[in-house]
Each structure stands twice: as C-alpha cells, then as structure tokens.
Amino acid sequence: MDQELERAALVALLRRGDRPWPELTDHIETVGSARDVLEDALDASGQGALFDTEPAADLESVAAEIAAWEREGMRLVTILDDDYPLDLRLVHQRPPFLFLRGTPVSNDLRVAVVGTRAPTPEGIAHARAIAGGLAERGVTVVSGLAAGIDSAAHGTALAVGGRTVAVIGTGLRRSYPAQNAGLQQEIAERGLLISQFWPDAPPSMISFPMRNAVMSGYSLATVVVEAAYRSGARMQARLALEHGRRVFLMRSLMTHEWAREYATRPNTTVIDGPDDVFGELDSLVPATGELTWA
C-alpha cells in the first residue's frame, strides 16, 4: 500500500499545479517521497487536505483511481519506481510519470526511427529497410505512431515479428491520427505504448515536442529518415545530441542546412542505407553489457 500511496501522492501533487512539473519532479526525486512533499505543500498552504476530507482518505481516493486505470490496462510508473526506464531517468526532460500499455522490457536495445508525416517513396523504403533490419536483429524499434515514416517503422517491425514501442503525443485512451487506431492496438498487444500524459489528454502543439524528448531519452540512438527544419524529427535529433545519444542522418538530408550542421557534431553519423546503422549496433551497447540484442 505504501507504494500505491506514493503514486497517489505524486498524482495529487501534479494535479494541484503549484509548481512546474520538471521542478516538482526534481524535488520529489531529491526528497525521495511524494507523500512527504505533499504533506509539506499542504502544511505550507494551510489547506491540510487535498479536497475537503482527511489527507489519508484523499490519497486512498486517488489510489482507487489509479487502480481503475490499471484495470483498464494502463499501468502507471512514476519517477520513484524502480522500473521507471533508466535511460529516460538520466535526461532533464524526464516526465514525472509514464502510462504503459503492453509489455515493458527493461534490458532491450532501443533505436528510434523517425521522420516526416509526408514522406517520399524513397523515404518509406528506407524506413522499412532500417526498421525491418533492426527488428530482425532483435533491436526494439521505437517511433511516435505518426503518419508516414513512424507508421512505416512500426508496421515493418511488427511484420517481421520484431518488437516495437510507440511513444505517443496523447493519452492512451486516444488514437492520433485516427487511422492508426488499429496499429496502436496491435502495438499494445505485441509491443508497448508509452504516454507521459493523462489518459484522456488530446493532441496539442506542445504534446508532440514533449513526446520527442521522451522518445530520445528512452532510446539509445535516433535514425532520422526524412525531415524538414520545422519537424519533430529534426527536434528529436537535436535533443538526442543534447542527451549524448547517437544520431544517424540519411545522406539525402544533407540538402538541408540543419542536417549539414548536425553532421559536424560529435555522435552524428551520416548514413547511405540500413547497413550503416546495423554496423554500429555494437557501439550502442554500454560497457556494462546489460542490454541485450540478438
């Protein structure tokens, strides 16, 4: 029950809206207890309770709501839980919680394959070749469930019998774009859906950049297939470099000034095709050897 009440306290703190979520996440991690942080917040405000009842009853009410989410197949993992993804925990933009639907795997090698929603036929072909080859080698293919390159990456990973993870920009109860509802369900059944938003959260202008930050932090590398300057994929490449992760850029991107500039940075590799990514897989595994891939 203690861990359940810790999760409930974290949810209650976030709903209060007293502090920005990143600041609150840092503070909760430092203190080591969301319940202690909540008690301090209530004491400071003189409120004494979350609503109009005793604090313990308040937390039990929120815990019951969390239990209802989990009965619906949405597992809540917080920054205080041991099974919060370690790689994501290390980045500044880590969210205070994740909702998961599907099967988490803690020691898989994860590579994000991302790109434009309006790809060329060549872009689709590259995305399929890269995602399919990664999946066949036992690598988890991560993408954002958007139309275009993302959908091609997810679909191909599933088609070859591999594992794929979708980091989405809405709550888990929503499907965006609507035409990907079937793909979203298949990923939940055969891989994993991740959301950093409340279950009913709609898509928004800020939710997708936030999603890209989580996707970068969750993955050990990002492959950008096709992307314009004003795109989530370009943003994810920038974030991945900030996170100290490897970035692979298709050579066709070198027509863009942003890609040429990124290509000069450490940890960036310009690739001509899938084999250039596959040849770098060993270099993605940390010295601990705790990640596994076939």
What spans do the regions from the language model cover?
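Short, small/acidic-rich helices and loops at N termini and domain boundaries
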Residues: 1-81, 262
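Glycine-biased, small-residue-rich flexible motifs in mid-sequence functional cores and linkers
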Residues: 1-6, 79-294
